[in-house]
C-alpha cells in the first residue's frame, strides 16, 4: 500500500493485492471477516490510469475494477438479444486429436457419411461437426466466475468479485461434452442428430478417467496374443467392425477374431456408495460393473416417436434401432442393448426406468424393515409374507451400460427440474453413465427463440410474403424485434406504467435464466454449475449468472452470461443459414377455428 497527498484535502492510496494462489503455504486466508472486507474493497477500487498517476480531481469518473459497475442499465443486453447474437458454429477438425473422430468430422463437413441418404446443407454439416468436436475434444475454458483484469504492468490476473478471490493463474474447467442444439424450427435438427449418430456409429464410449485405475487386467498366466489384443480393443473402445468388414470383402476370414473381441467387452467398475454412518461391522457395497457400448439413447415425447421413425427410415440406411414406447415392453438384457446403434425411447417409457431398485409395490431396501410382521396363514405357523425382498426389485439394464450419448428431443422440460424438485427423468439421468448429453430444442426456454420467429409472429396478421431484404442483415432483424424492449428503457418516452412493463419483462427473463441454469446443472452436468457443496467449489447460478436487474442477491456480469451461453448452445444466425439455402417466401395468415365442446368447457 502506498499513500500520497494531492493537497490538504485530497489524497490517494495505491493498493497492491496478493493473489490467493500465491503464498498459500504461509499466508492464512480463512478469516471470513477479512474476506468480507476484501469484497467491499474490490467494489470501491478505482483502476483508471489517471488516478494511478495522481492526475485526477473530485469530478473525475471512477473506473471500477468490476467494469459492470460502470455500465448503465440500458447498456445491458437482454437474454433474447444474447441468444440471437451467439456466434454461428465454426468447427475446427484439426483441434481433435483422435484420428477416427477427426475423420468423422471431415465426413460430416463433406456430407459423406456412410448410411446417410440425404445431402445436408452447409449449416447442418457445421452444427453436426461442432457437436462431434465438443464430444471428442472438449475445450478448456476459464472459470466463468472469473473476470480478467490487466494490471499496471500489462499482465492479466483474475478476480471473482462475489467470492472476493484474486488469482494470478485462472481456474479452468473442461467444457461439457454436450449442450443444446437450438437451431430454429424447420432447419433439420433431427437430421443433424442422425448424421452425428451415423458418423460415430463405430466409435465406442470410453472409460471415465476417475474409474480407469485397475482396468488393465492382471492374468494368472500369460494369455494368448489373440486374447490380449481382443481385451485391449474392448478396453480402449477401438473401432473394429468396418476394418474387418473391409478385409472380409477381400476374402479373408476373421470370425475367430470377432468372437474374441465380443468375449472381452470393455468395462469398468463403479465403487459402491460410502455408508453415511460408521459401524463396527460395515458391509461393503458391491461395485457396479459397467460395459462400454457404441449405442446412443434418444428420448422424445410420445407424439414425436413416429416422426423420428419416419426420419430414420427416410434419411438413413443400416442403423440398428430399438424402439421402446409401450409401458409393458421389457428392455432387453444389457449385452443385447449394447448391440444397437440407436435406442429410441418415448419420454413416458424412459421415465419408467426410475423404478430401478424398487419392487412392484414401490418399496426400496432403504425404506423397509428387516423384521417380518406379516400375518400367519390360517392356523399354521407359516406367514403370508409380502415383505420387501431384494431379489424382487427391478434392475434397469441401462445401469449396466456406458452409452455414447443421450439426446433428448424437446428436452427443455428439464428446465423445470432442480436439485430439490426431482422427477422420474432426472432420477434416470442421474444413474446413467453417458459420455455426452444433448438437448434438442429450438426454444430452450419460453423466451428464447430465433429473431426470425419473433419477426414472423409480429407479422402474423398479414397475408403478404416476408420481403427477402428484411432478413438479409441480422442486426437489422434483431433491431426490429428488440425495438420494443429497447424502448422500455427510455423512461422519458413512456407513461408511468413502464415500471410494471419492465418488471414483468425482467421477471420472465429471470425465469428463463433459472431454467437454463437447471438444464446446465441437472442435465448437462456442466462445471462449475453442477458442483455441490460437498465438492467445496459450489457455484451459485443465481449469484453469478443472473443480472442485478433480476434480484437483489444477483451479481452476475454480462461476460459470464455470454461465455456460459456460448459454451452450452449451438445455433446458426439467420443470415448464415440464408447463405446456404434460399427459403421460399413466407406467407402467414390468421385462420379462426371453432372450438370444440371440450375447449369451451375448459374456458
Protein language model features and the residues they cover:
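Charged, low-complexity intrinsically disordered regions
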Residues: 1-126, 227-232, 238-267, 273, ...
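Inter-lobe connector of SF1/SF2 helicase motors
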Residues: 123-129, 338-340, 355, 438, ...
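Conserved P-loop NTPase motor "coupling/switch" region that bridges the ATPase
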Residues: 405, 426-570
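Surface-exposed beta-strand-to-loop junctions
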Residues: 17-19, 101-112, 172-179, 287-292, ...
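The conserved Walker
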Residues: 185
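SF2 helicase/translocase NTPase motor core
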Residues: 204-408, 412-421, 493, 545-549
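Catalytic P-loop NTPase motifs of RecA-like helicase/translocase cores
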Residues: 188, 413-417, 446-447
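Conserved pre-motif I regulatory segment
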Residues: 101-182, 191-265
